Amino acid sequence: MAENSEGLGTVPEHERILQEIESTDTACVGPTLRSVYDDQPNAHKKFMEKLDACIRNHDKEIEKMCNFHHQGFVDAITELLKVRTDAEKLKVQVTDTNRRFQDAGKEVIIQTEDIIRCRIQQRNITTVVENLQYAFPVLEMYSKLKEQMTAKRYYSALKTMEQLENVYFPRVSQYRFCQLMIENLPKLREDIKEISMSDLKDFLESIRKHSDKIGETAMKQAQQQKTFSVALQKQNNVKFGKNMYINDRIPEERKENELKQGFEEEDENEEEILTVQDLVDFSPVYRCLHIYSVLGDEETFENYYRKQRKKQARLVLQPQSNMHETVDGYRRYFTQIVGFFVVEDHILHVTQGLVTRAYTDELWNMALSKIIAVLRAHSSYCTDPDLVLELKNLIVIFADTLQGYGFPVNRLFDLLFEIRDQYNETLLKKWAGVFRDIFEEDNYSPIPIVNEEEYKAVISKFPFQDPDFEKQSFPKKFPMSQSVPHIYIQVKEFIYASLKFSESLHRSSTEIDDMLRKSTNLLLTRTLSSCLLNLIRKPHIGLTELVQIIINTTHLEQACKYLEDFITNITNISQETVHTTRLYGLSTFKDARHAAEGEIYTKLNQKIDEFVQLADYDWTMSEPDGRASGYLMDLINFLRSIFQVFTHLPGKVAQTACMSACQHLSTSLMQMLLDSELKQISMGAVQQFNLDVIQCELFASSEPVPGFQGDTLQLAFIDLRQLLDLFMVWDWSTYLADYGQPASKYLRVNPNTALTLLEKMKDTSKKNNIFAQFRKNDRDKQKLIETVVKQLRSLVNGMSQHT
């Protein structure tokens, strides 16, 4: 059973191997057969048996197939035997056809030989014709020359002439027509020279007309390149956290004016910028240069071209008389010059020898000297700072454009520093008007604020810092008036305006910082100081206004340090940098304060004089009124109110003003007594006058301004007091006895003053006692007066002799 089962398992395997042998390539049969021997023992015998059985099966199939196709094979052989007859007939026909083709070919050979003979004859005829017609190419070339002349192809015509002379004419020189052609060529050359020169003149006229457009295009390209570079620099600086105040324009809200608008008027949407080749056809120059080169007269052409261009340069450099009136006048002037030198630079690079670098440098140096002289002269007429600024921007773009073409422009930037001084002068004049307007519009009263918003609005304009003021509740008032923040803002605007000119001057931030500080110093020390002094001296400015002006200058002086920090910030200078220039605000505002203080003293004295002029004493009264004069009480009340306003002033200023007022009042009262037009004074008038002086002394002792020590202010009236005491007490014996002694009771009474007043009283006594002169008391008093007068005169005479 085991053997049977093993045999049953082997049979399918042998069948698989047989199928694989039948279906596999012969080269791969080896491994398959090897698997038979690798199997169980005696397996190959069984396989051989299986293989024999398979072969017998295939033999049977072959036999069946042969039996099936045998009849067809017999039929095919039979058909072949039938076709043999037809094949023999076909062979006969092919042989006949070949014979007939051979016969026909003989005729073709004969005809071909005839054709060859004809070709040989034709070639011989052509050779003869060519030998006879040597002149034809000459005529054709000459005809071509005429066509080239008609088509204005003069350079080609000259080349054709060279070919005729060098190649064609020698072949037919024996013919008369050739001699005529040879004689006509020089005339044609002269015609070409004249025509090309005419084209050159037209070209020169054309570029003169197109210089504006060429220069405008070149300057626009330079402006765009500069804008791109600035934007790139800005991007880099922003990336690395740097400020870009100078080259980026200061804050965004500041308007850019300036010239980009002038160059973008024509076609704002034009994406492709035209080049000089697009604007000007240079072919006439090239043709003329080539023609003169071919003619061997290149030097004549170069000399003529350079001479004409120098003439055009002089015309371009000649400005219009009213060029300084508008920026367009300057722009046309610059674009023409740029256009001229752009053309010369193009000619320099595309031609060889027509212009040289030495020639263009010489031409540029001549032009540069003329340009600087013209700009220096015309810019001096400019009074508008905006126009001067636009001129500066034009000069910068003009210089940058030509520098891009290789022309040195350092002298132009040196000129800009001269123009910068003029620009600052125009700015100073403009800001003088601005300051005057601010002062005229100011109400010279402290700025009132009622809420936090108003407080912040003022603080945003002016750097006011006072902790005590911040603690006060609303409503409250800033100590300064409206003009202070306005002036501070305008000083910053001036710095911005000055900085505008300093941009693009190829200077370091430190130099620009120094220039800004110098310009600001001029604004403070000259313009603002002058405006303040003029304001202080105006007749309508009263004491209250002068007090406010002093307060204002104090706060402006304190703000100068913030202006210095502001300049440092916008120029991006390190705080540690030692500045060679400082702001002179301290001296400027101190001088203004001194002037205002002096004006306060003057106006206060004038006001006192106005009150004193209202005095109406009855110098002959017998008895006083018992009360002070009305004018004097009004004057004292006025002084009290004024000195209350002075509480905001620095202590020394208020004290000086108060002392000056009291001294002036004392002097005015003394002059009133000693007036030469006043001839008589009664004792009653002296007593009334004494009541007024007492009120003055009471005013002085009331300390109208704090800070006086003891009776310092009352000493202003000491001369009057001692004089009036002398006359009212009639203490002449003491005065005369103690005169000249340091401890004298009447030390401040001058003998001349006492004599003058005593004579006025003596005359009054004579007049009043004309009928009572025989009274003993009156006679004694009169004698005493006369005696005192004599002694006083002796003292006065002694003083004069001693002097």
UniProtKB/Swiss-Prot annotation:
* A cellular component annotation (GO) from this entry: growth cone
Q: Which residues form the signal peptide?
A: none
Kindly state which keywords UniProt assigns to this record, in alphabetical order.
Answer: Cell projection, Cytoplasm, Exocytosis, Protein transport, Transport
* Compartment annotation: Cytoplasm; Cytoplasm, Perinuclear region; Cell projection, Growth cone; Midbody, Midbody ring
Cysteines engaged in disulfide bonds, as pairs: none
Record GO biological process: exocytosis; Golgi to plasma membrane transport; intracellular protein transport; vesicle tethering involved in exocytosis
Chief localisation class = cytoplasm
Q: Does the keyword Chaperone apply?
A: no
Function, as annotated: Component of the exocyst complex involved in the docking of exocytic vesicles with fusion sites on the plasma membrane. Together with RAB11A, RAB3IP, RAB8A, PARD3, PRKCI, ANXA2, CDC42 and DNMBP promotes transcytosis of PODXL to the apical membrane initiation sites (AMIS), apical surface formation and lumenogenesis.
Family classification: Belongs to the SEC15 family.
The entry describes its oligomerization and partners as: The exocyst complex is composed of EXOC1, EXOC2, EXOC3, EXOC4, EXOC5, EXOC6, EXOC7 and EXOC8. Interacts with CNTRL. Interacts with RAB11A in a GTP-dependent manner.
UniProt name for this protein: Exocyst complex component 6
Species of origin reads: Canis lupus familiaris (Dog)
